[in-house]
Amino acid sequence: MNRRERLTRCYSHEELDRPAVYSRTGFPGNDPSYDKLKAYLQEHTELKAGWSGFRETPYPTESYREPYSEDFERHVTILHTPKGDLQCSMMASLKGQPGMAETYFIKTREDAEKYLSLPLPKIHGDASSFFVSVEQIGDDGIVDVSLGMNPAGTVATLLGTDAFAIMSVMDRDVIHDLCQREMNIIMRRLKFILDNKIGPFFSMAGEEYIVPPIHGPIDFHDFNVRYDKPIIDLIHDSGGYIHIHCHGSIKKVFHEFINMGVNVLHPFEAPSMGDITPHEAKELAKGKICLEGNIQINRMYDATPEEIKEETELLIQTVFDDHKGLIVCPTASPYIRGEGEECFPQYKAMIDTVLEWNRRMK
């Protein structure tokens, strides 16, 4: 079974010769300390090449920068809408670290109405690059078509956590209007993609913005399920598969991922980062969802190779008892600048444990 076939069988929930093993690849930019790890992943793990070759007509914006501190500068963006301007700002690192949102486009109901006055963007793009990616990855993996953030996740990034939570109580109708708008945009993206015979592997993220403890199961259903399911249904109707990335406490809403028809769910986090153990996740997912995880990313920097080997073996024993539905994977990309050599032995231990499990079973 080659790597492409193995991942395909994970997504379609068929029996496997061994678990797949994979890592997200959002490495720190221009960091040669990770070159050795990149080469090992390329040679030994199931690969996913990302594709998002569609384009949308941009909205009129202005931006400027201003000094803030030795570590950050402030980036300000002004968005022009038919009903007036909106403004957001973020802190951009001057030292190669992640940025931080400071203020958001939507702060009030009036801001939301301004945003809703924007026309829906037109979708275009060059589909040929997708087929080039498929040819390039060959039997080593799959090409993942990213649909971006889901509707509610996009809205959450427009408002920020606090304003979203407050408006979900005080102006719930506006949240629904915003989610409906974003769903319509994603449906347009998806129809463009499907019309160009692109697929069958798709992904979305953003559901994690509407999970406990900030939001309860009712909000998860109203804002995630309600607007994700039509998208997922269209994917399934085309013969495709959907991968969802959702951190956090998901045990109380796990059944909703099943109801939506999610094919692969990443990650599934035990306390303290989440609230669901591998055993609990497998009991709920068995026969329905492929689980992708779940080695906490900090363990790749803090643990020993022997500890990672033990964690990986226990994960396989717990989740792969039916020989289906497991992609062994850390919870996030390698992310600490300059620490590639430090985490390499732990990644190698995870990967080698999966590969050796297959050899032991023969």
Segments (PLM) and residue ranges:
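Compositionally biased, intrinsically disordered low-complexity regions
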Residues: 28-31, 52-55, 86, 101, ...
